[in-house]
Amino acid sequence: MRASLIQIGVKDDETVEFRRQRVASLVVEAGREGSDLVVLPELWTTGAFAYESFAAEAEPLHGPTYEVMAKAASDAGVWLHAGSVPERTPSDGGSATGDGPLYNTSLLFSPSGELAATYRKIHRFGFDKGEAVLMAAGAELVTVRLPETTLGLATCYDLRFPELFRGLVDAGAETLVIPAGWPERRQSHWTLLARARAVENQAYVLACGTAGTHARVPQAGRSIVVDPWGEVLAEAGTDEEVLTVEFDPARVGTTREQFPALKDRMLGLDAPRR
């Protein structure tokens, strides 16, 4: 299976619509070069730290980014994880103005351009500010069966919560896809956690970040693909880049069979008394 991670440079002086079209052309190019799966970063239309832009640039699920990315997936003939967008939802009263809560929502399209899945980010970053107060939390784990593998979907800060990934694996995930907007100052955590999630779940990890600087926050870049044994198959630099790698989905089953650590889990034990 061939995957391309498009590490987008989010530039403050670039309009959102121009960026959509620019990214769509990169998706189509990846498809022409033989990729089966293309992955984009988190919140690439706004920038993950451009908090003041979330409300202004939020869009309904079937909004402009949906339309452009659906066409790109179809034109490219690829499975497209289109990263995430700030999704504006209808109010409880069903208002057409979409004044309900915002979500950090990932979109996955099939090679025909149909929406195959959405995932609303569960763990929001910011503690008592930023995304944590501007967006609502998702509540559902999402896996998607592709012909070659089963994807488990997560987003950025989710990477720090191993129980989410164990839940995805229990639901059948073999390839963990993680779009992100990870800052440069915590780049070492990014690499370490991506490899840890691969090792402990005996799964592939495809983690796609953003490049450059936006909202005065330098981005880590360093998109990475890790195999089920924790070996790094490919890693990007810090600039905008298309990281393409070939990987064998059957390696997940082989690894789990030859080193069946997941079968030795001892869940359900009582916590030790203090």
Task: Describe each model-derived feature in a short phrase.
Residues 61, 71, 90-174, 184-192, ...:
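Active-site catalytic loop in hydrolytic enzyme cores
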Residues 61-81, 159-243:
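CN hydrolase (nitrilase-like) catalytic-core segments centered on the catalytic cysteine
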Residues 7-13:
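Short polar catalytic/cofactor-binding loops
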Residues 80-83, 87, 122-129, 205-209:
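Short Pro/Gly-enriched beta-strand edge/turn motifs at strand-loop
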Residues 1-5:
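Extreme N-terminal starter segment of soluble prokaryotic enzymes
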Residues 118, 143, 210-274:
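C-terminal beta-strand edge segments of enzyme domains
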